[in-house]
Structure formats: C-alpha cells, structure tokens
Amino acid sequence: MVGIKVREVYKYENVELSNGVKVSAYEVTVQDGEVVTVSNGNVVVNDKQFSFSIYNYGINGEKTYNLNNVPADIDGQEIVKEFVVFVETDIA
C-alpha cells in the first residue's frame, strides 16, 4: 500500500513575528509538514499593512508568492517566508 498524502488546513490570527510584525492567515494548507498554499493572508507592520497568498505549483513544489499593496519600505516576501517557517515549525 502506498502512503496517502494528508492535507490539513489551519487558521492563524495575529501571529507575532520578529520586529512586531503581525500576520493573520485564514486558510493555511499543509501537506506532509510543508505549507503548500495560503489564502487570505494579512500582514501588519508599523501601522502599515498588505495582503498575500501563496500557491504551490509544479512538480518541484515551487512556491508563488502573491503580495498586494506592500509598502515600499517593507520586504514583504521575507516576512511571508518567515511566516511559512513559523507555521511549519508550529505543526511539526
């Protein structure tokens, strides 16, 4: 028998990352311990905010980051990557 890939969906609200960054994501899909998609993500940094989603495409599992309205002085992709690491550590 071949193992079955199990997907689980999590909800995170007001997760505090480094430097006071807060992230909420209402549909975080995890498969085999790895974040594969995030829908309805929101980040608040110093009273500024932006939204994001993540999709996992292709055989190589490459992640596509969709960031919306990121302020010019904020590295949105690094914040989202930090959130992914947080989630994968949290569920391990």
What are these regions (language model features)?
Residues 53-92:
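Mixed-charge, Lys/Arg-enriched low-complexity segments
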Residues 5-7, 48, 77, 81:
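Surface-exposed charge patches in extracellular/virion surface proteins
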Residues 1-37:
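Negatively charged, low-complexity tracts enriched in Asp/Glu with abundant Ser/Thr
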Residues 33-63:
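A short, structured beta-strand/loop element
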